[in-house]
Amino acid sequence: MIPFCFVVCASWAIWHIPAYILTLAPHANPSTLAQVTAIHESKDVTPGLPGLFGGVADVVDWLALALIPIFLVIGMFSVRVAQMEFQHWRSVDRVALFIGRVTMMLIISMTCVMLYEVFLRYALEAPTLWANELTLWIGGFVFLCSGFYGMQQRSHIRIFLLYDAVSRPLQRTFDVLWTTLFVLFAFFLVFGSYRQVFVIKFYNWEMFGTAFDPPIPATIQPAVLIIIVLVAIQAVLNVISDWNLEPEIHTAADDIDGDEIEAIKRTVGDG
Protein backbone atom coordinates (compact mmCIF):
# COMPACT_ATOMS: atom_id res chain seq x y z
CA MET A 1 0.00 0.00 0.00
CA ILE A 2 2.83 2.41 0.86
CA PRO A 3 4.59 1.95 -2.52
CA PHE A 4 1.26 2.60 -4.26
CA CYS A 5 0.72 5.81 -2.29
CA PHE A 6 4.29 6.87 -3.06
CA VAL A 7 3.74 6.27 -6.79
CA VAL A 8 0.49 8.26 -6.76
CA CYS A 9 2.04 11.25 -5.00
CA ALA A 10 5.21 11.15 -7.09
CA SER A 11 3.18 10.88 -10.30
CA TRP A 12 1.07 13.88 -9.36
CA ALA A 13 4.12 15.94 -8.40
CA ILE A 14 6.01 15.04 -11.58
CA TRP A 15 3.02 15.89 -13.78
CA HIS A 16 2.72 19.28 -12.06
CA ILE A 17 6.41 20.21 -11.94
CA PRO A 18 5.73 23.26 -14.17
CA ALA A 19 3.60 24.62 -11.32
CA TYR A 20 6.53 24.30 -8.90
CA ILE A 21 8.89 25.92 -11.43
CA LEU A 22 6.54 28.86 -11.98
CA THR A 23 6.09 29.27 -8.23
CA LEU A 24 9.63 28.81 -6.95
CA ALA A 25 11.86 29.82 -9.88
CA PRO A 26 9.95 31.51 -12.72
CA HIS A 27 11.90 32.09 -15.92
CA ALA A 28 13.42 35.50 -16.55
CA ASN A 29 12.98 35.05 -20.29
CA PRO A 30 9.40 36.14 -21.16
CA SER A 31 9.16 33.70 -24.07
CA THR A 32 10.20 30.69 -21.99
CA LEU A 33 7.99 31.84 -19.12
CA ALA A 34 4.99 32.04 -21.45
CA GLN A 35 5.81 28.62 -22.88
CA VAL A 36 6.02 26.89 -19.48
CA THR A 37 2.90 28.74 -18.31
CA ALA A 38 0.99 27.48 -21.35
CA ILE A 39 2.17 23.93 -20.65
CA HIS A 40 1.01 24.19 -17.05
CA GLU A 41 -2.39 25.56 -18.00
CA SER A 42 -2.95 22.81 -20.56
CA LYS A 43 -1.82 19.96 -18.27
CA ASP A 44 -3.11 21.11 -14.86
CA VAL A 45 -5.46 18.50 -13.40
CA THR A 46 -7.03 20.93 -10.90
CA PRO A 47 -7.22 24.24 -12.78
CA GLY A 48 -9.96 25.63 -10.54
CA LEU A 49 -7.89 25.62 -7.35
CA PRO A 50 -6.04 28.83 -6.42
CA GLY A 51 -2.27 28.82 -6.06
CA LEU A 52 -0.51 29.06 -2.71
CA PHE A 53 2.50 31.10 -1.59
CA GLY A 54 1.98 33.64 -4.34
CA GLY A 55 2.43 31.12 -7.14
CA VAL A 56 0.41 28.75 -9.29
CA ALA A 57 1.00 25.47 -7.40
CA ASP A 58 -2.20 24.70 -5.52
CA VAL A 59 -2.86 22.87 -2.27
CA VAL A 60 -3.02 19.44 -3.94
CA ASP A 61 0.35 20.01 -5.61
CA TRP A 62 2.01 20.96 -2.32
CA LEU A 63 0.30 18.11 -0.45
CA ALA A 64 1.55 15.56 -2.98
CA LEU A 65 5.06 17.00 -2.77
CA ALA A 66 5.03 16.90 1.04
CA LEU A 67 3.77 13.32 1.17
CA ILE A 68 6.55 11.95 -1.05
CA PRO A 69 9.31 12.00 1.63
CA ILE A 70 6.80 10.84 4.26
CA PHE A 71 5.83 7.75 2.26
CA LEU A 72 9.49 7.21 1.38
CA VAL A 73 10.53 7.08 5.04
CA ILE A 74 7.57 4.90 6.02
CA GLY A 75 8.27 2.57 3.12
CA MET A 76 11.97 2.33 3.94
CA PHE A 77 11.35 1.28 7.53
CA SER A 78 8.45 -1.05 6.77
CA VAL A 79 9.97 -2.93 3.84
CA ARG A 80 10.40 -6.67 4.31
CA VAL A 81 12.91 -8.77 2.39
CA ALA A 82 11.42 -11.70 0.49
CA GLN A 83 13.01 -15.14 0.57
CA MET A 84 14.11 -14.86 -3.07
CA GLU A 85 15.94 -11.58 -2.46
CA PHE A 86 19.52 -10.94 -1.34
CA GLN A 87 19.61 -11.84 2.35
CA HIS A 88 22.81 -10.11 3.52
CA TRP A 89 21.25 -6.66 3.42
CA ARG A 90 21.83 -3.78 5.82
CA SER A 91 19.91 -0.75 6.95
CA VAL A 92 21.56 1.42 4.29
CA ASP A 93 19.93 -0.80 1.65
CA ARG A 94 16.40 0.19 2.66
CA VAL A 95 16.18 2.92 0.02
CA ALA A 96 17.01 0.50 -2.79
CA LEU A 97 14.66 -2.14 -1.39
CA PHE A 98 11.78 0.32 -1.24
CA ILE A 99 12.53 1.60 -4.75
CA GLY A 100 12.35 -2.04 -5.81
CA ARG A 101 8.78 -2.19 -4.48
CA VAL A 102 7.98 1.07 -6.25
CA THR A 103 9.34 -0.40 -9.47
CA MET A 104 7.04 -3.39 -9.06
CA MET A 105 4.09 -1.03 -8.72
CA LEU A 106 5.18 0.76 -11.88
CA ILE A 107 5.29 -2.54 -13.75
CA ILE A 108 1.74 -3.29 -12.62
CA SER A 109 0.65 0.19 -13.68
CA MET A 110 2.30 -0.20 -17.08
CA THR A 111 0.62 -3.57 -17.57
CA CYS A 112 -2.79 -2.12 -16.70
CA VAL A 113 -2.33 0.70 -19.20
CA MET A 114 -1.39 -1.77 -21.93
CA LEU A 115 -4.36 -4.03 -21.17
CA TYR A 116 -6.68 -1.02 -21.19
CA GLU A 117 -5.35 0.07 -24.57
CA VAL A 118 -5.71 -3.44 -26.02
CA PHE A 119 -9.31 -3.64 -24.80
CA LEU A 120 -10.24 -0.26 -26.27
CA ARG A 121 -8.39 -0.86 -29.53
CA TYR A 122 -9.65 -4.35 -30.34
CA ALA A 123 -12.91 -4.67 -28.42
CA LEU A 124 -14.34 -1.17 -28.84
CA GLU A 125 -12.24 -0.01 -31.81
CA ALA A 126 -11.54 3.23 -29.97
CA PRO A 127 -7.78 3.41 -29.26
CA THR A 128 -6.39 6.13 -27.04
CA LEU A 129 -3.85 8.78 -27.93
CA TRP A 130 -1.95 8.45 -24.66
CA ALA A 131 -1.58 4.78 -23.70
CA ASN A 132 1.45 3.98 -25.86
CA GLU A 133 3.37 7.08 -24.80
CA LEU A 134 2.42 6.63 -21.15
CA THR A 135 3.72 3.07 -21.36
CA LEU A 136 7.01 4.34 -22.80
CA TRP A 137 7.22 6.93 -20.04
CA ILE A 138 6.57 4.47 -17.22
CA GLY A 139 8.85 1.92 -18.86
CA GLY A 140 11.71 4.41 -18.78
CA PHE A 141 11.36 4.80 -15.02
CA VAL A 142 11.04 1.03 -14.60
CA PHE A 143 14.29 0.49 -16.50
CA LEU A 144 16.16 3.08 -14.44
CA CYS A 145 14.79 2.14 -11.01
CA SER A 146 15.29 -1.57 -11.61
CA GLY A 147 18.96 -0.85 -12.26
CA PHE A 148 19.25 0.73 -8.82
CA TYR A 149 17.39 -2.15 -7.19
CA GLY A 150 19.41 -4.68 -9.19
CA MET A 151 22.67 -3.19 -7.90
CA GLN A 152 21.54 -3.69 -4.31
CA GLN A 153 20.52 -7.27 -5.14
CA ARG A 154 23.89 -7.99 -6.81
CA SER A 155 21.90 -9.22 -9.82
CA HIS A 156 23.72 -7.40 -12.61
CA ILE A 157 25.61 -9.61 -15.04
CA ARG A 158 29.08 -10.51 -13.80
CA ILE A 159 31.78 -12.76 -15.25
CA PHE A 160 33.34 -14.85 -12.47
CA LEU A 161 35.91 -16.81 -14.48
CA LEU A 162 38.90 -14.87 -13.12
CA TYR A 163 37.20 -13.59 -9.97
CA ASP A 164 36.60 -17.08 -8.53
CA ALA A 165 40.16 -18.18 -9.28
CA VAL A 166 41.89 -15.63 -7.03
CA SER A 167 42.17 -15.20 -3.28
CA ARG A 168 39.72 -13.17 -1.22
CA PRO A 169 42.11 -10.19 -0.80
CA LEU A 170 42.52 -9.99 -4.57
CA GLN A 171 38.75 -10.29 -4.98
CA ARG A 172 38.39 -7.26 -2.74
CA THR A 173 40.90 -5.44 -4.94
CA PHE A 174 38.80 -6.27 -8.00
CA ASP A 175 35.68 -5.03 -6.21
CA VAL A 176 37.33 -1.73 -5.30
CA LEU A 177 38.73 -1.33 -8.82
CA TRP A 178 35.47 -1.81 -10.71
CA THR A 179 33.56 0.30 -8.18
CA THR A 180 36.09 3.11 -8.58
CA LEU A 181 35.73 2.95 -12.36
CA PHE A 182 31.94 3.06 -12.07
CA VAL A 183 32.01 6.00 -9.67
CA LEU A 184 34.31 7.87 -12.05
CA PHE A 185 31.94 7.10 -14.93
CA ALA A 186 28.98 8.41 -12.92
CA PHE A 187 30.88 11.55 -11.92
CA PHE A 188 31.91 12.48 -15.45
CA LEU A 189 28.48 11.65 -16.83
CA VAL A 190 26.80 14.00 -14.36
CA PHE A 191 29.51 16.65 -14.64
CA GLY A 192 29.38 16.67 -18.42
CA SER A 193 25.62 16.74 -18.87
CA TYR A 194 23.98 18.31 -15.81
CA ARG A 195 23.49 21.69 -17.49
CA GLN A 196 22.05 20.16 -20.65
CA VAL A 197 19.74 17.98 -18.59
CA PHE A 198 18.63 20.15 -15.68
CA VAL A 199 18.59 23.55 -17.40
CA ILE A 200 17.66 22.90 -21.01
CA LYS A 201 15.50 19.80 -20.55
CA PHE A 202 14.11 20.03 -17.01
CA TYR A 203 13.91 23.74 -16.23
CA ASN A 204 12.49 24.55 -19.66
CA TRP A 205 10.21 21.50 -19.34
CA GLU A 206 10.78 19.95 -22.73
CA MET A 207 7.86 17.85 -23.94
CA PHE A 208 7.72 14.77 -26.18
CA GLY A 209 6.08 16.61 -29.08
CA THR A 210 3.19 14.21 -29.75
CA ALA A 211 -0.60 14.25 -29.37
CA PHE A 212 -0.46 13.26 -25.69
CA ASP A 213 2.80 15.19 -25.33
CA PRO A 214 4.19 13.83 -22.05
CA PRO A 215 7.31 15.46 -20.57
CA ILE A 216 9.52 12.44 -21.28
CA PRO A 217 12.71 14.43 -22.09
CA ALA A 218 12.17 16.71 -19.09
CA THR A 219 11.80 13.82 -16.66
CA ILE A 220 13.66 10.78 -17.96
CA GLN A 221 16.96 12.53 -18.62
CA PRO A 222 17.20 14.01 -15.08
CA ALA A 223 16.15 10.61 -13.73
CA VAL A 224 19.09 9.03 -15.58
CA LEU A 225 21.57 11.25 -13.75
CA ILE A 226 19.86 10.87 -10.39
CA ILE A 227 19.67 7.08 -10.67
CA ILE A 228 23.26 6.75 -11.88
CA VAL A 229 24.38 8.62 -8.75
CA LEU A 230 22.26 6.35 -6.55
CA VAL A 231 23.65 3.26 -8.29
CA ALA A 232 27.20 4.51 -7.74
CA ILE A 233 26.50 5.10 -4.05
CA GLN A 234 24.92 1.66 -3.79
CA ALA A 235 27.96 0.10 -5.45
CA VAL A 236 30.19 1.66 -2.79
CA LEU A 237 27.84 0.44 -0.06
CA ASN A 238 27.95 -3.06 -1.55
CA VAL A 239 31.74 -3.14 -1.38
CA ILE A 240 31.67 -2.04 2.25
CA SER A 241 28.90 -4.48 3.19
CA ASP A 242 30.53 -7.45 1.43
CA TRP A 243 34.06 -6.73 2.62
CA ASN A 244 34.15 -9.42 5.32
CA LEU A 245 32.08 -12.04 3.50
CA GLU A 246 33.64 -15.40 2.81
CA PRO A 247 34.65 -16.06 -0.81
CA GLU A 248 31.81 -17.45 -2.90
CA ILE A 249 32.50 -19.96 -5.66
CA HIS A 250 30.05 -19.76 -8.53
CA THR A 251 29.10 -22.85 -10.53
CA ALA A 252 26.60 -23.73 -13.22
CA ALA A 253 24.38 -25.12 -10.49
CA ASP A 254 23.75 -21.56 -9.28
CA ASP A 255 21.58 -20.96 -12.35
CA ILE A 256 19.30 -23.88 -11.55
CA ASP A 257 16.05 -22.93 -9.85
CA GLY A 258 15.06 -25.91 -7.71
CA ASP A 259 11.56 -24.61 -7.06
CA GLU A 260 10.96 -24.15 -10.78
CA ILE A 261 12.16 -27.68 -11.52
CA GLU A 262 9.83 -29.10 -8.88
CA ALA A 263 6.95 -27.11 -10.34
CA ILE A 264 7.70 -28.53 -13.79
CA LYS A 265 7.82 -32.06 -12.37
CA ARG A 266 4.45 -31.56 -10.70
CA THR A 267 2.99 -30.20 -13.92
CA VAL A 268 4.29 -33.13 -15.96
CA GLY A 269 3.11 -35.56 -13.34
CA ASP A 270 -0.36 -34.06 -13.27
CA GLY A 271 -0.52 -34.32 -17.07
Predicted regions and their residues:
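Alpha-helical transmembrane segments and membrane-interface helix-loop junctions
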Residues: 1-271
